Amino acid sequence: MTNIRKTHPLMKIVNHSLIDLPAPSNISAWWNFGSLLGLCLGIQIITGLFLAMHYTSDTLTAFSSVTHICRDVNYGWIIRYMHANGASMFFICLFLHVGRGIYYGSYTYSETWNIGILLLFATMATAFMGYVLPWGQMSFWGATVITNLLSAIPYIGTDLVQWIWGGFSVDKATLTRFFAFHFILPFIIAALVMVHLLFLHETGSNNPTGIISDSDKIPFHPYYTIKDTLGFLLLISLLLTLVLFYPDLLGDPDNYTPANPLNTPPHIKPEWYFLFAYAILRSIPNKLGGVLALVLSIAILAVMPFLHTSKQRSMMFRPMSQTLFWILVADLLTLTWIGGQPVEHPFIIIGQLASFLYFLLILALMPMCSLIENKLLKW
């Protein structure tokens, strides 16, 4: 008799995705981040659901409702901090996942890569709107500054901003709609994840060598299920350490002050995971130019498949490209640092140089380096 997991219509899908899936025998721990992102999304949806049961999206009571969750709801504090720090873990995994894709040339699976870029944009939008909900000072002013950027769009900009606000400033209508979108987007993300996996399973996974591995596959279960479980344990340990010992390490103290439209905080800055993009935005003196650079800092990932000039897929055997890759990583860390600094000398010029280097590396230096490597290998 055939096993039910191979015949049942629903279990068959699970079986082909998680159990009998042929996987390369040599994928390293860098391939763990996909499943870790799935875990993060699950944690965020569950904790978010419980928070939504007690949260009120009204300007008068939003801040108080978050305080009420932390003080009066059973284990409300741990749910709130798991959700807030879970977002940080989510972005750490996202950045490592994308970095892995760049290093090992996974972007040559263009459909999977493009859905991944959509997922990145959707996650960033969700995180931004979630940051507005506690209605602290940084929530309010962050929402004001970022939504205001759309006014840089010629002709329709001002109308567009007022349409998003639902009025002439960030107010009750804005908070209510942000809550609605923040609630629905994770489910859209979950649907996109399914599409992401659908396209990935059409081609099979890449591997560190970048060489086709069809002749050497192993079943996903038990080999990679056990490997993913180790990743889960490490991620949960790190998250719980953050939540239980340093819950406010990655937050902003300004957000413990209720939103006040009459008092602007001295340094308006987003959560740490947006600082690199914020630094790129601030490095251009022109408003529209800054907004374009901000969008392009992520959208530039979409041109990577077209800029792949190397005859090899992975960077595993390309030391020159590896060097440029790690310079890019260092550059992004520099941008993250600059994004959190005030707009004054020397931070302005460092930010401008780092922003210029970011685009230069991706658009020119890395493709040129690949061509040089081809020449050196006489390919």
Curated annotation (Swiss-Prot):
PROSITE patterns, A to Z: CYTB_CTER, CYTB_NTER
GO molecular function, one term: ubiquinol-cytochrome-c reductase activity
Residues noted as binding a ubiquinone in the record, renumbered to the chain: H201
Cofactor note text: Binds 2 heme b groups non-covalently.
Binding-site residues for heme b b562, renumbered to this chain: H83, H182
Residues annotated for heme b b566 binding in this entry: H97, H196
Function: Component of the ubiquinol-cytochrome c reductase complex (complex III or cytochrome b-c1 complex) that is part of the mitochondrial respiratory chain. The b-c1 complex mediates electron transfer from ubiquinol to cytochrome c. Contributes to the generation of a proton gradient across the mitochondrial membrane that is then used for ATP synthesis.
Similarity remark: Belongs to the cytochrome b family.
The protein's name: Cytochrome b
Species name: Ochotona erythrotis
Name of the coding gene: MT-CYB
